[in-house]
């Protein structure tokens, strides 16, 4: 991710407990200006960019979407590649809860 200046104001850091069934890590936010996450777990995760209204269910699938490597894999949305709908995360460690750290700006 590098050093990114968030000149439009940041939000408080957040963390999400991601399950092997999938967890929503961002809601639809039309005013989103920045969103970044880091996989702080020992297991790879996958992000699904999901459009609200496409069935109303979690669409994250292990092995598909945006890959986040274990122990620090990261992804960033900014003014170049912004996405405004829901974001889901999933991993394949059966029965385990893994941590995803998030920073957002509005």
Regions found by a protein language model. Name each.
Residues 37-38, 48-50, 68-69, 78:
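Beta-strand-rich, repetitive solenoid scaffolds
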Residues 5-30:
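Surface-exposed ligand/attachment interfaces on beta-rich extracellular proteins
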Residues 36-41, 91:
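Asparagine-centered strand-capping/turn motif at beta-strand->loop junctions
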Residues 31-34, 44, 84-85:
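Short, surface-exposed beta-edge/turn micro-motifs
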Residues 40-64, 100-102:
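Short, surface-exposed beta-strand/strand-loop-strand elements in extracellular ectodomains
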Residues 26, 69-84:
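Beta-sandwich interaction modules
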Residues 21, 63-64, 70-73:
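Tight coil/turn sites that cap or link beta-strands
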Residues 84-106:
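Terminal connector regions
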């Amino acid at each position: 991710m590098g050093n990114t200046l968030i000149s439009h104001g940041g939000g408080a850091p957040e963390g999400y407990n991601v399950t092997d069934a999938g967890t929503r890590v961002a809601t639809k936010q039309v005013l989103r200006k920045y969103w970044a996450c880091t996989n702080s777990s020992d297991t790879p995760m996958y992000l699904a960019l999901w459009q609200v209204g496409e069935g109303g269910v979690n669409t994250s699938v292990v092995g598909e979407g945006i890959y986040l490597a274990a122990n620090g894999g990261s992804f960033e949305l900014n003014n170049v590649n912004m996405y405004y709908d829901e974001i889901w995360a999933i991993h394949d460690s059966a029965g385990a809860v893994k941590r995803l750290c998030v920073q957002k700006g509005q």
